């Protein structure tokens, strides 16, 4: 941003230029293998295993200079007084191993399960990995023989439930580290201060989720879903 010395925004500082640069790169490498099989036409199995890498890089640079010799040479390097220069760069990575298995019998009874292990650079080595899982089941009641009299108007009816554990990353990229910062202290003398205490106990936030649902359809035209979600944190 340019504060022109010929205007009220820049006349008292003889012109000012502020520059900011931000770069963000994200690389995701995902590999999955799935397998489906039907046994005796009534048993259906769907399996999956996978491996993922998430690599994110952020680079930030800023500068502000004032006192320019002429208004038409306003590159920040032409400012005679450097008011501020700052910048930082961060890189975070996460590696994940995952698997999933689903089974159903005659499209009537459903069972499922999943498991994954995630390792993140946002934690110190001993707490880097977290393991999470879920199980699920469903019953398509409309496929039962005793539901035959209702099929003229009730064309689908299914109840389902799932329970599982997932993890949440901390918002800080280096929250577990003890950090120090450079600063201009008394009489603008340089110094070092502690900006963050070391936290070896920082771990994955664990969330326990229970989901209950009821799906039904009327006359093959009206579809409805009733859903309940309960969550607990640790």
Region spans (language model):
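Short, flexible, mixed-charge acidic loops at enzyme active sites
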Residues: 2-6
